[in-house]
Amino acid sequence: MTIAIDFVGTNVGSGTKTYNINFCNELESIDLKEDFIIYLSKNYFNQIKFLENKNSRIKYIVKSNIFSNIFFRLFWMQFILPFELKIMGVKKLYSPMNFCPILAKLFNIKIILALHSNLPWVFFHLMPGNIIRNLLTRKLMEFSISACKILIVDSYFAKEEISNILKIKKDKIKVVYLGIDKKFLSSECVKNFVETFNYSEKYIISVLSCVRYHNILNLLKAFKVLINEINFNIKLVLILQILDKKYYKVLNSYIVSNFEKDEVTII
């Protein structure tokens, strides 16, 4: 049986991009028993670490970087991809990024969908973007969940939560924990060290994107309570990817007003 995977995604630095590229690299390195067709953006394809002998079980279909744009990507996914899968005789599709081609269900293609966040149902007001776009996003995610045969979430808490919210049978939902980027476990990780940072100091580290739904402001408030209540020399280090500049200004303002110099460091 041929299995298709849709890795056509954003080129913005993110957990999604890291997940997709690492997934491809892992597939390339193992002895596969099934044939795979992998759809991916050109910018992803250029970052795959092919072995000397490319995995013969994998066929790559490289799409234009224009599909890094969410609107073009969704149009292609919903109205073109299902017919491509049908023509190639694909019977199983893995969609790893919250959405899947809904029409594929009409062609008896088994869809496995990965849902990375319950945010649209739990904290809708914290979603980035305007309300109309966010409502459409949530509805399309609901249609995708309805169309899939298996839904993958990243924790048992998320499974209980989404099952209760959308009234999904729990035997449809599987839990697969997200993994760590392998580069941080290898001897090559020294290349990622920040030379100006003192690693011998005591510190708490948090790595995340700077967006409101990560609620970094509450993290800062909690850290302030911690250092005020205990006499302990420790710092907070935030490694941020700044996706929301206005929120970043709010965080900086809070840090300046509430902490001594170097108590909180942003990298």
Each language-model region and where it sits:
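Carbohydrate transferase catalytic cores enriched for Leloir-type hexosyltransferases
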Residues: 1-267
